[in-house]
Every structure is written in structure tokens, then in C-alpha cells.
Amino acid sequence: MQYFFPELNYLQTGAEHLHTINGGNTVFNSFRVTERTKGSRVISTSDVKKEFLKKFISKPNSKLGLNFDTTLVMGVLNVTPDSFYDGEQSFSEKQFVEKGLNLLKDGCCILDVGGESTRPGAKEVASSIEIERVIGVIKKIKQSAPSAIISVDTRKAIVAEKALQAGASIVNDISAGSFDGKMFGVVAKYKAGVCLMHSQGLPENMQNKPHYENVLLDIYDYLKEKIAKAESTGISRKR
């Protein structure tokens, strides 16, 4: 498998075949091509087909109301008792809602609400508890801020479905659908967005000698496989 990485060109004067990445302000005129068995090499953008180049220079067309012309900031709302920050404050549901609304006022573009800690060593939380923690918060934030874009941080399809019904529009799954085989079906059913993450094992054991042959290429291969599975389930790349 070959992976192509734009080589950024900050010195535009005199450079040939300059292109902007996804219609933004960053320019490039070459790719670093990386393969597992052949290492990497640099080629000019003129050496690739125009249709392939379009994937890098076309402006993203999100179906989620996100503007990719600027930096997007995600505000994180940990509705868990063992959060390194939120949990230590012993917030009530009302306070979590207020904090979420303040994050939106401060300029966050996506509000990520999670009811299960997935830090290294964390134990799994029952779906019923996770639902109890996040659904009321999501509903009340959407009532006060109807245009807010909310993601739910969960590995479980039933939690994702309840959150989408409550007003979330994105599922942020650290397991990329590996933990719950029904996850992609729920995302497709509700035409939601999905954020695919990488991890080895479960939070309980993720730090017990994780092994990679090539950490970058292993992660790229993993995410490529998950993207293909999501698409085969009916989830558009635009989501």
C-alpha cells in the first residue's frame, strides 16, 4: 500500500506546480510517497493523475454544517466521575449543561459529550449508566442552542442511537466500530457523522505491551480498513 503526503512549500516564490491543500492557504508541489517495503520517496504533483490530485486540492464538502475554511475547535465535556478535570469538580447535570453552553459561547465548533472514561486502565461502564449520564445533558444543550453541533463519545451502538435521537449529530468512536459491530449501522441509519479513532485492545489493557511493526503505517492501514468498512455500510466519506 502506498500513502501520499503533501510536502508543504512555504517558500512560494519561483516554485512550479503549486497547489493549495483542500482550497486552504497551505501550498505544496510535491508528495512524499511511503510504502511499507520500499521506504519513501518524493515526487512532483505533475507526476500524478489529475483525478488523484483533486482529492488533495478540492475543498471539503461537509454535510454536517462544518466550515473547513478555518480551524475547527472541539470542546470536550466529560460527564464522568473519574475525569481528570470535569469529574474532579463534581458537577451536577445543570452545571455540565452550563459548561457546555459556555464552551459554545467561547467559540468551540463541536461539543463532544462522553459518559465513559476510556483512559488507560479504565473499566467498561454499563450502557445504561452511560445513557443516564449523557442524554439529559445533550437534550438540554440542544434546547438552549439548537444550532449546536454535538458529538457523542462512545463505543456502544445503543448509546450512540440514544444520543443521536437526543440531538447529537456525530459519533466519536475511539474503537472505530471495532467494539460494537452495530455501530456503523446506527451511524448509517441516522445519517450521522462519525469520527474514527485508533487504539489497540481495550482501555483496560491498551498499555500492556502494544506492538507495532511500523507505528505510522500500521495506523494508516487500520484506518483505511475502517473507512472502507464504514463506506460499505452506507456511510458517505463526507460524513
Each predicted region: which residue ranges?
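N-terminal accessory interaction module
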Residues: M1-G65
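Glycine-rich anion/phosphate-binding loops
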Residues: E51-S58, F84-L104, I129-E132, A176-G181, ...
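Conserved, mostly hydrophobic/aromatic
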Residues: L77, L103, G107, D153, ...
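Alpha-helix-loop-beta-strand connector modules within alpha/beta enzyme cores
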Residues: F68, K123-V152, E161, A188-S199
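Conserved anion-binding
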Residues: V79-S83, T118-G121, A166, S178-R239
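Glycine-rich, proline-tolerant flexible connector loops at the mouths of alpha/beta enzymes
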Residues: P81-Y85, C109-G136
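Structural preference for beta-strand elements that scaffold enzyme active sites
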Residues: S30, L72-V76, C109-D112, I149-S151, ...
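Catalytic beta/alpha-barrel core
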Residues: E130, S147-R155, S169-D180, V215-I219
